[in-house]
Amino acid sequence: MAHFAELDKNNVVLRVCVVDNKHVPSDKHVDGETWCTNFWGGTWKQTSYNNKSRGEFASTGWLWEPTKEKFYVAKPSGHDSWTLEETDSKLTWQPPVDWFNTEDCKLADNSDVKITINTWNESAQTWKGQHHKTEANGNLTITNFTWNKSTKVWDRD
């Protein structure tokens, strides 16, 4: 079985369909794309779970980049400063401040903390994080942090 993504005029994926291999005999994307166009109409591009030559497996709402011949997810809302970059043969949105390891983080006082929730703050151009801890009495304590891009440690808010 082969998978093909239908594209609109703006290269947005409308749907992904499965096509029997008997309709795509040569295992070349052009044959299958032509078959889909002849059968359903529209513009089609092959996508694959197994072969990542076209980036990630396409999903509805994703985009097709014709110059790179890759599918990629649309830019997340509220992430205007992020740029599309090709990494590990796929297209991904990258923040202007490097990602960090949330499992083994240092605070400004050099103590360790595990950040369990983190989000991008576009207006501050940095990461916001939270550490959740359940106390012995069952109460939940939430501590808020801001990533300090200069020192590369978490500052308590």
Where are these regions (language model features)?
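Interaction-interface detector
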Residues: 1-157
